[in-house]
Structures are given as C-alpha cells and as structure tokens.
C-alpha cells in the first residue's frame, strides 16, 4: 500500500490557511502545519500579534489532529523584505512587500524547509490561486530532476507551470504570487483556488474552526498594521524636508517631511489649503513634491512604461513575442484594478516597452504591473523593473509584470483561447 502523500501547509492563524489544511486532510494526505514568524510587532494594546496568531494556528492543528511546527524567519524577512522596502521608499518608489515576501520567505525559506527538513512531497498555502497542474502532477514533480546546463529542451519549455486566477476573482491573489519561481510552483497546492471566500467561511463554521473564523481579515502592509504610516516609516528613515510645488505654475504651496512619504495619485496634506491637491511628480534630487489641483489632472496619467529588466515566470519570454517583437495585452498595476489594453514591445537589448492604449492614472514607482494577452494564446511574466514616460519626461522605475485574463501565467503558449475578462 502506497504511503499517504505528505503535504506541509503554511498556517497563518487565519481562516483561509486553516480551511486549506482541512481540505488537504479530507483528501487523505498526511498534513503538517507550519507557522512562520516573520515580524516582531505589537498591536495597539501591547500584545504580540505573532504570538496570538501562532496560538490560533496551533489550535487549528489540534482540531485537525495534525503535527504543528513553528519557524522564525524574522532575520530573513528583515534582510530580504523590509530592508528592500525601506530602500525602495527612500528612492521615492512604492514597493509591494507582499510580493517580495512571497518570493523570498514563503516560497523560498518555507518551501525549502518543508521539502528539505520535513520531507514534504508538496507544500500548500491558503492563497486564492490555481496552477495548471493537477494534484497528482504536483506530487510527480518530486521525482523530476531539474534540467542542468544553460538550456532546456522544448518539452520542458512547453510544459512550464502556469499560475491561474482563482475562481473567486475578487479574492484572487495571483497578483501577489507573481515572483514565485517555477521550482516552487511545481511543488505547490492551492486548495482554495476553486472556492469563494463565503464558501471557505462556511466550511470553517461547519468544522469547529470558529476561533479563526471570528478574526478580522488583515489588510494593508502587515508590519505597519493600524499604525500611522508616516509615523512608522519615519522611525526608520531620516526626514528629508522639501516643498510642495504646483505643477501648473511652480508656486510653492507648503512643506513636507520627506518625498518618500508620498506616492503618485495620493492626496497631499498641505496646511492652509481648502481644496484637495494630488501628488503627480517627485523630484528626488531636491526632494520636492509636485502637486495638481484635481484628482483627474492630466499630469497624473501615463501611457508608456519602459522596462529595465523582466522576470519571466517561465524563465524566458514567449516565442511569439520573440518572433513578432510586439504583442497585444492588457495590464494592471494594482490588485483588483480593471485590466487596461496595451501593447508589449520587445527591444533588442531584452527590455520590454508597455504602451497603454489609454493612459492610466497614478502609475507609481515601484508598484507591480500586470497584463493579459488579447490574442488567442495566453502568457504572463512576473514583475519587471519599469520606467514611466510622462509629460515631464522624468526617469522612473516600476516593478511590474504581465498578468493573463485568468491569472498570472508563465509567458509560454497555451493552446486554447482566452475566455472571459479578469477583474
């Protein structure tokens, strides 16, 4: 008799990961729960939220009768995620730490711990996402050796794992998984990929998981929590006072504590002014922030992004883009925003230009961009480094990637047409 497949499931202390572990248990797998402590923080009442979450994760394991492990990646999180976050903010960009955390912590540190230390056949998380592999195909990856050398054969390229949008398009989290490597995707299960959030809550309620069901869902940047962001960031970065300047007439309207505290499209807090002003440009040399008087001011819109580097989920660009040098797409740069039609252009130096058919508002430095192909094949890449071209022709950088209508895919052809529109 074959031994049960061993799946190590990341438990956050929340309802999603708890139900993910429950569903794996129901499928007959040998499940182990692991709680990751990535940040030392206190809430407003002086209680360590990580300790509380760990207790909730442990209770989940008790209810499900599965082994529980706790690991600390506080040092790794600081070095690979938070330090990068601070560095990007200091440069005036708007990074997404959730994407970096998934890349370096959950799907690298935790992934290797589960496989190497716990002997996992596969790992699992409570993310709302899917891949192109069925469960049994995921387990088979354990016995497939990674190709050696610089080149892979055509079979391996054609069978790159695709990251697909979840059934619940509102809760879909593939945007945050866009930098997960092929190696990790091949060994990962997403039990919630075909479920809605409401159904997940129903499952929790019917299976004695009330303690996680009653918890409020975490939103925003995890290590900031409910704290004032300006006060938080100024604990780590030195204030760099500068001026608020009108984009229309260069008139000085006020002062600020640091240009890194503002992102494009954000309402600027300028004392003494009744009408709202919005950030449209930042001068990193002088530390000045340019603002406009309307939320729909033309200076807020961009229609061209230039990449400095691209990270492909499939580890290489699609053959069609290489062949034709151009490709029609849709893209997004914020989670849950509507997709915008665009055209990808592959340059000789390997950079990619993204030209939006219609200019988009508040495309900020360091954000993640996504796109979906409008043709009969689907592709996607993960975040790249982009520059924005605006009326002021200022050099910018954007971490972006390409997102398919059904989710993040590995820029490799898929035989059937795109169906539906992603949200």
What are these regions (language model features)?
Residues 40-41, 124-130, 136-423:
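AMP-forming adenylation/ATP pyrophosphatase catalytic core
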